[in-house]
Curated annotation (Swiss-Prot):
Cysteines joined through disulfide linkages: none
Alphabetized UniProt keyword annotations: Cell projection, Cilium, Cytoplasm, Cytoskeleton, Flagellum
Source species taxonomy: Eukaryota, Metazoa, Chordata, Craniata, Vertebrata
Highest taxon of the lineage: Eukaryota
Any Gene Ontology CC annotation: axonemal A tubule inner sheath
Protein name, as recorded: Ciliary microtubule inner protein 2A
Subcellular location: Cytoplasm, Cytoskeleton, Flagellum axoneme
Family matches, as InterPro entries: CIMIP2A, CMI2A-C-like_dom
Alphabetical list of PANTHER family matching this protein: PROTEIN FAM166A
Pfam families from the UniProt entry: CMI2B-like
Function: Microtubule inner protein (MIP) part of the dynein-decorated doublet microtubules (DMTs) in flagellum axoneme. Binds to the intra-tubulin interfaces.
Family the entry assigns: Belongs to the CIMIP2 family.
Record-level GO BP terms: flagellated sperm motility
Length: 321
């Protein structure tokens, strides 16, 4: 049985698909054929030294190195999940030495058959519906007669664990005793010294410069923005060219705003911008401003419509005068 012959328009096998950007020997020296035909010729040419392994797909099956025949060790949970604190935690543990209400103490029960001196601590079974821990942290227990030693009941909470463990009365810290009392209505804390008001307006002021456009003249090399009059500056570096261009621009703007004229002569008409909307020539197309009475014109071009609006404006002014 003969194999079906492919048409010569199809790329012969084997070949690399277009878009492969890897290295292939002697590909850069082949000219005149497509990428597929060139790679097919190089793959089938015995004179071209190449690796026997294909680059696009592995020739051999992958080998599994991990051995699944051995039994896995039992899973051990993380230590942080089973203990209340992180290992090596040496910081404060609140209510560590306090007796929590509702938690029954351990009872030492001597068991028969065991040597004397060996006791086994067992927990007494709790009744049904009993809550071993209260829903809120209890206050530390105090000792009777200690309130007069410390002077104020609030100092028990202020000193914490050190107050009820130590038998000797604690010395009151000067300067802290009055903070536990609430101020009376006729007693107030000393007022704070007046602070300097923040002047918000100073952040909106521009710095005083020696030159009015000094910020614009400090050009940075590599700035690709627009600099007026810079296109006509040649033969100098960027920084000096920007300074010269800005000087020329400022001089041109000053002359434009203050035209040269003799005393008593009227300023030229080109100095003041025209504010006339209606013209006999009509407005230019793409004018997006509002033109009164133009909405009443139909089947007319923009120029004819604006001329018609100009005529209506003249008629209106003649009637009002």
């Amino acid at each position: 049985m003969t194999a079906t012959q492919k048409h010569n328009l199809f790329t012969p096998e084997p070949h690399y698909i277009p878009g492969y950007a890897g290295f292939y020997p002697q590909l850069r020296y082949q000219v005149g054929n497509t990428y597929g035909r060139t790679t097919a010729q190089l793959l089938t040419d015995p004179s071209v030294q190449k690796s026997p392994c294909s680059v696009l797909s592995p020739m051999s099956k992958p080998k599994f190195i991990e051995d699944f025949s051995k039994s896995k060790p039992p899973w051990m949970p993380c230590r942080d999940l089973t203990e209340p604190y992180i290992p090596h935690y040496t910081n404060l543990k609140p209510y560590k030495n306090f007796e929590i209400l509702g938690k029954l103490p351990r009872q030492e029960v001597d068991t028969q058959g065991m040597p004397q001196g060996e006791n086994i601590s067992r927990h007494v079974p709790l009744p049904a519906g009993f809550m071993p821990y209260p829903p809120y942290p209890p206050c530390p227990p105090g000792r009777k007669g200690e309130a007069r030693d410390l002077g104020h009941p609030g100092l028990l909470l202020a000193y914490g664990e050190e107050a009820w463990k130590n038998a000797a009365p604690l010395q009151e810290t000067p300067g802290r005793y009055h903070q536990l009392y609430h101020c009376r209505r006729d007693e107030y804390l000393p007022p704070h010294p007046p602070q300097e008001t923040l002047d918000v307006g100073r952040y909106q002021r521009l710095p005083q410069l020696d030159h009015p456009n000094l910020i614009q003249r400090k050009a940075i090399s590599g700035y690709a923005g627009f600099v007026p009059r810079f296109a006509w500056v040649m033969g100098m570096n960027y920084r000096d060219g920007v300074i010269q261009a800005m000087d020329d621009f400022d001089k041109n703007q000053f002359v434009f705003k203050h035209p040269v004229c003799t005393l008593g002569e009227r300023l030229p008409k080109t100095h003041w911008p025209t504010t006339t909307i209606y013209r006999s020539q009509g407005l230019i197309p793409f004018y997006m401003g509002f033109i009164p009475s133009m909405q009443d014109n139909y089947a007319m071009t923009f120029g004819n419509s604006t001329r018609r609006a100009y005529q209506k404006e003249l008629e209106r002014r003649s009637q009002t005068l």
